[in-house]
């Protein structure tokens, strides 16, 4: 018999302790991983509802199970809000992740062995953009473009040259570690020149796009995907969008998600997506995203003032790469040193990195999470100075301890969930 007062703390104290420790870590550590954020209590509430009990294979009005009349409403809300948010005429809210959304696009538009052109992982792309360790590089003929070593920006001339030479069936625009603004229109021009689909993965900038402070790829791309966390600050999940008004492609995309790549959708997560999309339609969300960019720019500028090398010389979005080659510090060691001071980052390869991806020569730094907990430009600059203090001599444990104390004070002033 199930009772409403059942809880994890009494039944599984070992698991409960781990959950409590992670909750404490999030409150007492400053989060600078660009792909992480804090979702609202409303999003968390949706994921903990009885919707998790319901199997709903298929799509609203076309389910393979009975009893779906209420979850149909949930999914339709998520779909309509996603369309409104991004100016789309098609939305599939069922992908469990961004990678699964991307896999569905490949399955819908390509045949195995077809040529795709995407950004190299080493230059800021994503695993699913053609990396040899991913399905995108194993099942398809992947050609990779990069950035201009001098400017740190995408080399559109190289993209066009590679497209003309290799005649890809699909060109991928998007990134996981790129601080510039992508010219979606230029990518579409190149795609049209060689008769390719343009597929945009805007996972990292979807929140900025929704707020209208980063160019919307929807008018240019055949298909757009995103995660629903990161800058969107929703639950972990994926989303596929389009505005080309091609019902044949829409059907192929739906079939590629279900039954092509997934079975039953996670209705409790789809409910959380619906909540997050509604939150993103609120004017306050635009204010938040504007501050995200202000904070990222302030941090990049401060690192440069302290003598550190920022790839491309700054940022125009929510993230930037810190190149530590000239400091003779590995990304792995920098990550660990900052972690000891309760500052969470992730090691990241920089362009033409001489070190392995398991060590790296850089850090990827993002501002969505710190902005979500209330940090402004002043706090962002102060935080950057603390980080530089640690990185100036990562062996100085006294500095790490001092910074840790300052971090704890700042976190107490700006709780994640106040």
From Swiss-Prot:
Task: Please name the HAMAP family in this protein's record.
Answer: SHMT
What NCBIfam families does its record include?
PRK00011.1
Main EC class of this protein? Answer: transferase
The processes (GO biological process) annotated in the record are:
glycine biosynthetic process from serine; tetrahydrofolate interconversion
What's an example GO cellular component term for this entry?
cytosol
Catalysed reactions listed for this entry: (6R)-5,10-methylene-5,6,7,8-tetrahydrofolate + glycine + H2O = (6S)-5,6,7,8-tetrahydrofolate + L-serine
List the taxonomic lineage.
Bacteria, Pseudomonadati, Pseudomonadota, Gammaproteobacteria, Alteromonadales
Organism for this UniProt entry: Shewanella pealeana (strain ATCC 700345 / ANG-SQ1)
Q: Which residues bind (6S)-5,6,7,8-tetrahydrofolate?
A: 121, 125-127, 356-358
Record carries keyword RNA-binding? no
Keyword Repressor present in the record's keywords: the answer is no
Q: Where is the signal peptide?
A: none
Kindly provide the name given to this protein in its UniProt entry: Serine hydroxymethyltransferase
Q: Gene name? A: glyA
For activity, the cofactor(s) needed are: pyridoxal 5'-phosphate
What family is reported? Belongs to the SHMT family.
Q: Chief location of this protein?
A: cytoplasm
């Amino acid at each position: 018999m199930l009772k409403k007062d059942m809880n994890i703390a009494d039944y599984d104290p070992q698991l409960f302790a781990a959950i409590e420790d992670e909750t404490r870590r999030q409150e007492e550590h400053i989060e600078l991983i660009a792909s992480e954020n804090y979702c609202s209590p409303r999003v968390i509430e949706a994921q903990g509802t009885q919707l998790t009990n319901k199997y709903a294979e298929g799509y609203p009005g076309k389910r393979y199970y009975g009893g779906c009349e209420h979850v149909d409403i949930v999914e339709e809300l998520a779909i309509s809000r996603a369309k409104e948010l991004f100016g789309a005429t098609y939305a599939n809210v069922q992908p469990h992740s961004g990678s699964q959304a991307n896999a569905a696009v490949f399955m819908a538009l390509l045949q195995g062995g077809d040529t795709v052109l995407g950004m190299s992982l080493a230059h800021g792309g994503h695993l699913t953009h053609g990396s040899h360790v991913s399905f995108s590089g194993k099942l398809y003929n992947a050609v990779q473009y990069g950035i201009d070593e001098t400017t740190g920006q995408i080399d559109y001339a190289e993209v066009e040259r590679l497209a003309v030479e290799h005649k890809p069936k699909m060109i991928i625009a998007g990134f996981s570690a790129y601080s510039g603004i992508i010219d979606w229109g230029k990518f579409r021009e190149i795609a049209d020149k060689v008769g390719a689909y343009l597929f945009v993965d805007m996972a990292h900038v979807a929140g900025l796009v929704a707020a209208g402070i980063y160019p919307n790829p929807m008018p240019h791309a055949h298909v757009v995907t995103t995660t629903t966390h990161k800058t969107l600050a929703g639950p972990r999940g994926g989303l596929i969008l389009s505005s080309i008004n091609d019902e044949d492609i829409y059907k192929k995309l739906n079939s590629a998600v279900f039954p092509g790549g997934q079975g039953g959708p996670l209705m409790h997560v789809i409910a959380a997506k619906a909540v997050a999309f509604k939150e993103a339609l609120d004017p306050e969300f635009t204010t938040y995203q504007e501050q995200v960019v202000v904070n990222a720019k302030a941090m990049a500028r401060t690192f440069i003032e302290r003598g550190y090398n920022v790839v491309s010389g700054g940022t125009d979005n929510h993230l930037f790469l810190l190149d530590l080659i000239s400091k003779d510090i590995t990304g792995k060691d920098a990550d660990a040193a900052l972690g000891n001071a309760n500052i969470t980052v992730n090691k990241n390869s920089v362009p033409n990195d001489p070190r392995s991806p398991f060590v790296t020569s850089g850090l990827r730094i993002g501002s969505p999470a710190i902005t979500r907990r209330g940090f402004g430009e002043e706090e962002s600059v102060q935080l950057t100075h603390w980080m530089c203090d640690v990185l100036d001599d990562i062996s100085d444990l006294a500095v790490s301890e001092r910074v840790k104390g300052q971090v704890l004070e700042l976190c107490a002033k700006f709780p994640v969930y106040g």
